[in-house]
UniProtKB/Swiss-Prot annotation:
Source species taxonomy: Eukaryota, Fungi, Dikarya, Ascomycota, Pezizomycotina
Gene field: ccr4
Enzyme class label: hydrolase
Reactions catalysed, as given in the entry: Exonucleolytic cleavage of poly(A) to 5'-AMP
Localization (cell): Cytoplasm; Nucleus
Disulfide bond annotation, renumbered to this chain: none
Protein name per UniProt: CCR4-Not complex 3'-5'-exoribonuclease subunit Ccr4
A family per Pfam: Exo_endo_phos
GO biological process: DNA replication; DNA replication checkpoint signaling; nuclear-transcribed mRNA poly(A) tail shortening; positive regulation of transcription elongation by RNA polymerase II; transcription elongation by RNA polymerase II; traversing start control point of mitotic cell cycle
Provenance organism: Aspergillus oryzae (strain ATCC 42149 / RIB 40) (Yellow koji mold)
Length: 746
C-alpha cells in the first residue's frame, strides 16, 4: 500500500504455505493506561482459520467483503509465512504509488470501516482488482481474524457495566494495538485478494482536443484515480514528507504505530480524508488545521500523550468515531465522550469554540488610477445574505449555533453594508420579515431607499406565513438617485405566458415550478442626469437542472431587452430636488448644486446596465456564456434536447455587451465557500460600452482560510461573500433633453 511499486514480490502460481498458528508478541504500546483492561492476553484458537487445502465458506466470498476494491491486470499473490515478510523492502517513492500499467475502476472506491462485529479495514491500495473478478474470489483472510491467526474477539476484556460508547472505545483500542506490525492493513488486503484471476479491464475513452463551440471549452477528460489509501503503519517514522499532503484525493491514511511527536499543519490539505489513524505515536497535541478535515468519519488517536483537543475539531461534524483511549485526556473532554460519545464531544467543542481573531480586511484593488478625476463614479454591491430558513444545522453542521443564528448574522451583514457605504446594494435571500422589520428601517438611517419582491410562492400564503419567504432587495442612496420605475420578473410565470409555450412540456414540468425572480429598478442620477438599469437576480441552484438555469437566464435577458427599449423612451424627469430637513436656526443653508437635465438614450443597449446576483452558474457554464457572449445556439448540450419553445428551437440572444466586473482580475477564487463546495456563483455584470470598472474588493485572506473549512462563521455571516466594485460612467452617447424645471435663480 505504501512501500513503493515493488511492495510485494510476485511469485509464480505455485505452492502456497499458509502461516502457522502463532501468538503475536505483545507490542510495547500495549501498556495499560488510565486503568483500562489489558489490551492483550491469550486469545482462543479459532476453528474458522482458513486452510489451504479446503474451500472456504460461500459467505466469505470476496464479492461480499468490503476489501474488494481492486482492478489490476495481474494476479495478486503475496507470500506471507508465519507473519514474516517474503519480500525485499524498498525505499518509498511517492510518485511510484500510482502504477502506470493499471486500469483503475471508480466503482471500487474507499468505504469507511466497520466496527465491532466486523473488524475489517478496507484500504484502497495501488493494486486494484475489478469487481467482476472478485465475484469468484476466495479470501484467505477473514475480518474476524488477525493476521497472526488470533481471533479478533476481545469482548472478554470489556466490562459490560460500561456504557456502549466506552465499550466501543475499548473494543477499537484493542483492535488497534494488534495492528502494530508494518503495513498491517495493506497486508490484510493483500491476503484478501490472493489467487484472484483478473479479467482485462477496458480503458476509458478519452476526449481528444477541446470543443470551443458557443464559447464553452470542453475540458479533456482526466484519468480516473484508482487508489485512495496509504498505509505507513509500523514504520518507525519520526517525520512526514510534505509531499504526502499533496495527495489530496486520499480517503484513508494510516500513520499508526510510528514515533511521530507532531502532526504538520499541512494535514489540513487532505480534505477528502474519511479515515485517519494516528494511534500508537508520541503525539501531545493536534494542530488547529485538523478541523479542515470535515469529511472525516473515523479518527483514531489511541495510545498517544494527548491531554486536550483543539476547539477546531468542532468543525468535524461528520465524525462518527473518535478513538481517544490510552491518552491522558482532561476530565471534561473525557467525560463527554465516555458518557455521550463522539458526536456529543464534537458538538461540545463546536459550541464552546471561542471567536477567533477576524481576518485582515479584503484588499481594495485599484484598476484605474485616473478614475479619481472622473466626473461620475458609482459603486455597486451584491450579496447573497443566506436567509434564516436556509441556515439550518443540517446544512451547516460545522457552524456554531450562535454564529448561525439570524439575530447574529443580520447584524454582521448590516455592519458590512454600512462599512462599504455603496451607492447601490443588491441583496438576495432576504425574507419579507427581515426586509420590512430590519434592513429597510436600519438602512434608512444611512440614506437608503429600497425595492423588494418575495419569490412567487408568497402570493398564495397568509401574511404571517409569507414573512419567511425570501426574495431580492435592492437599495439605493436616495440623495443620489431618483427611482423612475421598478419591475419584477418571475421566470416561471413569464415562460408560460410566452406564445410559443403551448405544448412545451418542459416549460411546465421543469421551469414553471421554480419560483425564482429578478427585481429591476430604473434610476436617474439627480446631479448628472445619467440613467441606470439595475437588475438583482437569483437563479435556481440545482446542478441537475442546467437547462432550467439556462432558460431562466435567457428569459431574464429577453425581459431586460424589452424593458430597456421602454426606458430609452422614458420622459425626462422634471423634479430632481431631494428632500431635505429644514436648517436649524442660525445655521447657514448650503446651496445644493444645480441638477443637470435628464439624459436621453438612442436605444436600450446605450443605457448603463448593472446586473447583479446569485446566478448559481460558474464561469464557462451555458448561462455564463449566454450573458458574456450575447448568444447561444439551440444545440447547446445543457438543453439536453428539452423543449422550451423558440428558445430551444431558434437559440438565445441579447443585444448587451456585458462583462463580469471581476473578470478584470480573472474572477475571484470563490464566491461560495463550504466544506463540500467552493466555486464562483455570484457576479456583478456591467455593459462595457457605457461603463468601466475602476476598483474592486479583493480576495479573502488565504492564511485565514487555512483554518476555516467553510462559511458561515463568526466573521462571514453567509456561505457567500459580498462583491463590491466601483465603476466610471463613460462619455454619454445619448443626447441631452432639456426639461422645464420652472423658475430658476439668477
Amino acid at each position: 500500500m505504501a512501500d513503493g511499486t515493488y511492495r510485494f514480490q510476485q511469485p509464480g502460481a505455485g505452492q502456497f504455505f499458509f502461516q502457522t498458528q502463532q501468538q503475536q508478541p505483545s507490542h510495547q504500546r500495549h501498556l495499560v493506561r488510565n486503568g483500562t483492561n489489558s489490551p492483550t492476553g491469550r486469545l482462543k484458537f479459532s476453528h474458522d482459520t482458513p486452510s489451504p487445502s479446503r474451500s472456504p465458506p460461500l459467505g466469505q466470498a470476496a464479492a461480499l467483503n468490503p476489501f474488494t476494491m481492486y482492478s489490476q491486470t495481474h494476479q495478486g499473490q503475496h507470500v506471507l509465512m508465519n507473519g514474516g515478510q517474503a519480500h525485499q523492502r524498498f525505499g518509498m517513492q511517492m510518485p511510484k504509488f500510482q502504477s502506470q500499467s493499471h486500469h483503475p475502476h471508480p466503482a471500487q472506491q474507499a468505504h469507511h470501516h466497520t466496527h465491532h462485529n466486523q473488524a475489517s479495514h478496507n484500504i484502497n491500495h495501488q493494486h486494484n482488482f475489478s469487481s467482476g473478478a472478485l465475484a469468484a474470489a476466495t479470501p484467505h483472510f477473514t475480518p474476524s481474524h488477525m493476521q497472526n491467526g488470533a481471533h479478533a474477539n476481545v469482548d472478554e476484556d470489556i466490562d459490560e457495566s460500561m456504557n456502549e460508547h466506552w465499550q466501543q472505545q475499548l473494543q477499537l483500542a484493542a483492535e488497534s494495538r494488534q495492528a502494530s506490525s508494518p503495513h498491517y492493513y495493506a497486508r490484510a488486503v493483500a491476503q484478501q485478494t490472493k489467487g484472484i484471476q483478473i479479467a482485462p479491464s477496458q480503458p476509458e475513452p478519452q476526449e481528444n482536443g477541446g470543443d470551443v463551440k458557443n464559447g464553452l471549452t470542453k475540458v479533456k477528460a482526466s484519468p480516473r484515480q484508482g487508489w485512495y489509501a496509504l498505509d505507513f503503519g509500523g514504520q518507525g517514522l519520526r517525520a512526514l514528507s510534505t509531499s504526502l499532503f499533496s495527495y489530496d484525493f486520499l480517503k484513508e491514511l494510516y500513520l499508526n504505530h510510528n514515533k511521530l511527536k507532531a502532526l504538520p499543519q499541512t494535514i489540513g490539505q487532505l480534505r477528502k480524508l474519511e479515515h485517519l489513524d494516528l494511534s500508537g505515536n508520541d503525539l501531545t497535541e493536534l494542530p488547529e488545521e485538523i478541523g479542515m478535515l470535515t469529511s472525516l468519519k473515523k479518527l483514531y488517536l489511541f495510545d498517544n500523550n494527548i491531554r486536550t483537543l483543539p476547539y477546531e475539531m468542532g468543525y468535524l461534524y461528520r465524525l462518527d468515531t473518535l478513538g481517544i483511549e490510552g491518552n491522558p485526556l482532561n476530565d471534561i473532554l473525557k467525560s463527554q465522550i465516555m458518557k455521550e460519545g463522539t458526536r456529543a464531544l464534537i458538538k461540545y467543542l463546536r459550541e464552546e469554540m471561542p471567536e477567533n481573531p477576524p481576518p485582515p480586511d479584503r484588499d481594495w484593488v485599484i484598476l484605474d488610477e485616473t478614475a479619481g478625476t472622473s466626473t461620475e463614479k458609482i459603486t455597486v454591491l451584491s450579496y447573497n445574505a443566506l436567509c434564516d430558513s436556509s441556515a439550518t444545522q443540517s446544512h451547516f453542521g460545522y457552524t456554531p449555533s450562535r454564529a448561525l443564528s439570524w439575530e447574529f448574522r443580520r447584524d454582521v451583514i448590516l455592519s458590512e453594508l454600512r462599512s462599504h457605504d455603496s451607492d447601490i446594494v443588491c441583496l438576495q435571500e432576504v425574507d419579507q420579515g427581515s426586509y420590512n422589520g430590519y434592513f429597510r428601517e436600519q438602512l434608512a438611517y444611512n440614506g437608503y431607499k429600497g425595492v423588494y419582491w418575495p419569490r412567487g410562492r408568497a402570493m398564495g400564503m397568509q401574511e404571517e406565513e409569507a414573512k419567511s419567504v425570501d426574495g431580492c432587495a435592492t437599495f439605493f442612496k436616495g440623495t443620489k438617485f431618483i427611482l423612475l420605475d421598478k419591475q419584477m420578473i418571475n421566470f416561471g410565470q413569464t415562460a408560460v405566458r410566452r406564445p410559443d409555450a403551448k405544448g412545451q412540456d418542459d416549460i411546465y414540468n421543469r421551469l414553471w415550478q421554480k419560483d425564482h425572480i429578478a427585481v429591476v429598478v430604473f434610476l436617474e442620477n439627480r446631479l448628472t442626469g445619467s440613467r441606470f438599469i439595475v437588475v438583482n437576480a437569483h437563479l435556481y441552484w440545482d446542478p441537475a437542472f442546467k437547462d432550467v438555469k439556462l432558460i431562466q437566464t435567457a428569459i431574464l435577458m429577453e425581459e431586460i431587452t424589452k424593458l430597456s427599449e421602454t426606458y430609452a423612451k422614458w420622459p425626462a424627469c422634471t423634479d430632481k430636488t431631494a428632500f431635505r430637513f429644514s436648517e436649524a436656526e442660525g445655521g447657514e443653508a448650503q446651496t445644493p448644486p444645480e441638477p443637470a437635465p435628464s439624459m436621453e438614450y438612442s436605444s436600450g443597449d446605450q443605457i448603463p446596465l448593472f446586473m447583479c446576483g446569485d446566478f448559481n452558474s460558474s464561469p464557462g457554464s451555458a448561462a455564463y456564456n449566454l450573458i458574456a457572449n450575447g448568444r447561444l445556439t439551440e444545440e447547446h448540450p445543457d438543453l439536453e434536447k428539452r423543449l422550451y419553445g423558440n428558445l430551444s428551437r431558434v437559440g438565445m440572444t441579447h443585444p448587451f455587451k456585458l462583462k463580469s466586473a471581476y473578470n478584470s482580475i480573472g474572477e475571484l477564487s470563490f464566491t461560495n465557500y463550504t466544506p463540500d463546495f467552493k466555486d464562483i456563483l455570484d457576479y456583478i455584470w456591467f455593459t462595457s460600452n457605457t461603463l468601466h470598472v475602476s476598483a474592486l474588493l479583493g480576495e479573502v485572506d488565504k492564511d485565514y482560510l487555512q483554518k476555516v473549512p467553510g462559511f458561515p462563521n463568526f466573521h462571514f455571516p453567509s456561505d457567500h461573500i459580498a462583491l463590491f466594485a466601483e465603476f466610471v460612467v463613460k462619455g454619454k452617447k445619448g443626447k441631452v433633453v432639456e426639461a422645464d424645471f420652472g423658475p430658476q435663480r439668477n
